[in-house]
């Protein structure tokens, strides 16, 4: 077994840097300790690292999880005896085995409750023996804070709120870690002395890079439209610490003309639709996928809608390596597991997911970029009666031999032809799959034979003759029969 002192100068500082770089915790530095706080599904988890003694850390949990904290600290004391254990792998192990820690220490919790119930102090002076023990490590101080809070509530039921707040702040400053506001000051005891004098030191809280980038990107995305969340469905990760997708390739669709485009976006991207010249804007905020998070990132769109995600190029960090060893995966697709081996530790890295899903988080603007309106779409009043013919049998000024109206799928409105649609709407028409007969005003699906299934009439005049027939027959010289003398006459005599 390698001693801790021999490993002090080699990789302990590097492990802390890798942990801060991968998981972006909230960092608070004191004189002798470093606090790394991370939110999780189980609440706020804080790792307290001793600057003077490498590989000596303790875990702090929320107020209602003290019994879990004792079990985790017992495991942490012997975890670094294994040479392959790193700070990042230790944190992931605690999250993955949360339920086992939750059930292993129920007896100790019951004993702690019995000890607290047996103590019944009458005055606040009974708290002095416990307050003298605050010179110990921070993990013990949090347990004492819980005991002190419980006894204060039992001994002083009618005390003022100001007295209780003063008692809590003078006992320890570690309790501020569990408040909603970020702590700016930390109270710690001087080491090596009797521990009666406490020093108050202002701590400048360094902001991590992720929070700065997120704030900058949030300002840029305030003017954009909808916000989508990209998540992997049922991800299966083996020996993966973190996974990032800095560049996203996807297919988008214009909200005006529904024209599809394939793009590749790193942070910001803007383009003009090739069909309707609509401006499309996107902002990609990549996230971090780990065993407890399946969110790939956040996508902000304006003037377009995401349709599908192309194969993704990801950067995967190995969980077993001490340094930040990144392995590149190219073309990760759904339902296709990809396997690679780490270049340093030679362990296999497996990445697999079932599907990529889009979830609409915020709809701040409509599809055209304006504010979202709560009004429903007004129904089109056609002024027609089923069974009776349409006005002019459905013919319009553009197509005088077309006896039908079309219901266009782009706006679900009825027009005689595509030119009538474009003259009334501000977007380009899409193919109409339903028609209204000009003779009976009955709606049906589009058919190539142009025969109404209700009345049997032809909605388009069928050309059967190959002769001129006084202008009622064939008028195209190319398709006209060569037996018709009008086919070879001069053009100024033909019309």
Curated annotation (Swiss-Prot):
GO terms for molecular function: zinc ion binding. Its main location: cytoplasm. Zn(2+) 3 binds at residues 437, 440, 452, 455. Keywords: Cytoplasm, Metal-binding, Zinc, Zinc-finger. Disulfide bonds: none annotated. Zn(2+) 2 binds at residues 410-411, 421, 427. Pfam families: zf-CHY. A zinc finger (CHY-type) spans 389-457. Transmembrane segments: none annotated. InterPro entries: Znf_CHY, Znf_CHY_sf. One of its GO terms (biological process) is rescue of stalled ribosome. It is found in: Cytoplasm. The keyword Zinc-finger applies. It comes from the Eukaryota. Residues 473-483 have a biased composition (Basic and acidic residues). GO terms for cellular component: cytoplasm. Zn(2+) 1 binds at residues 396, 398, 417, 420. Residues 484-495 have a biased composition (Basic residues). Residues 473-495 are annotated as: Disordered. This is Uncharacterized protein C18H10.09. It comes from Schizosaccharomyces pombe (strain 972 / ATCC 24843) (Fission yeast).
């Amino acid at each position: 077994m390698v001693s801790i002192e021999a490993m002090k100068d080699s990789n302990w500082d590097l492990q802390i840097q890798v942990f801060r770089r991968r998981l972006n915790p909230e960092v608070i530095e004191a004189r002798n300790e470093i606090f790394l706080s991370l939110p999780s599904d189980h609440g706020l988890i804080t790792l307290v690292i001793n600057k003077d003694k490498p590989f000596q850390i303790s875990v702090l949990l929320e107020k209602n999880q003290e019994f879990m904290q004792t079990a985790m600290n017992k495991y942490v004391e012997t975890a670094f005896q294994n040479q392959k254990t790193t700070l990042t792998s230790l944190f992931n192990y605690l999250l993955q085995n949360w339920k086992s820690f939750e059930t292993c220490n129920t007896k100790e919790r019951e004993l702690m409750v019995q000890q607290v119930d047996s103590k019944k102090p009458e005055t606040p002076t009974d708290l002095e023996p416990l307050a003298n023990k605050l010179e110990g490590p921070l993990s013990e101080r949090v347990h004492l804070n819980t005991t002190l809070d419980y006894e204060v509530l039992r001994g002083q039921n009618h005390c003022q709120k100001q007295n209780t707040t003063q008692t809590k702040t003078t006992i320890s400053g570690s309790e501020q870690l569990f408040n909603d506001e970020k702590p700016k000051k930390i109270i710690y005891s001087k080491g090596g002395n009797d521990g009666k004098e406490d020093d108050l030191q202002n701590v400048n809280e360094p902001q991590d890079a992720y929070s700065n980038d997120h704030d900058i990107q949030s300002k840029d995305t305030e003017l954009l439209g909808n916000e989508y969340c990209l998540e992997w469905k049922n991800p299966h990760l083996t020996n993966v610490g973190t996974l990032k997708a800095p560049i996203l390739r996807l297919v988008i669709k214009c909200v005006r003309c529904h024209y599809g485009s394939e793009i590749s976006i790193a942070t910001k991207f803007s383009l003009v639709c090739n069909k309707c010249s609509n401006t499309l804007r996107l902002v990609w905020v990549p996230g971090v996928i780990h065993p407890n998070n399946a969110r790939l990132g956040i996508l902000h769109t304006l003037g377009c809608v995401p349709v599908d995600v192309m194969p993704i190029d990801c950067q995967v960090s190995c969980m077993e390596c001490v340094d930040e060893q990144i392995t590149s995966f190219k073309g990760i697709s759904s339902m296709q597991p990809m396997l690679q081996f780490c270049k340093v530790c030679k362990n296999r890295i497996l990445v697999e997911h079932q599907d990529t899903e889009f979830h609409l988080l915020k709809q701040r603007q409509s599809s055209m970029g304006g504010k979202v309106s709560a009004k429903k779409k007004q129904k089109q009043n056609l002024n027609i009666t089923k069974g009776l013919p349409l006005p002019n049998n459905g013919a319009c000024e553009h197509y005088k031999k077309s006896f039908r109206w079309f219901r266009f799928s782009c706006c679900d409105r009825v027009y005689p032809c595509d030119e009538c649609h474009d003259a009334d709407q501000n977007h380009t028409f899409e193919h109409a799959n339903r028609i209204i007969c000009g003779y009976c005003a009955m709606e049906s699906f589009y058919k190539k034979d142009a025969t109404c299934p209700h009345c049997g009439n032809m909605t388009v005049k069928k050309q059967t003759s190959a002769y001129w027939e006084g202008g009622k027959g064939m008028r195209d010289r190319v398709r006209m029969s060569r037996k018709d003398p009008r086919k070879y006459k001069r053009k100024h005599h033909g019309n």
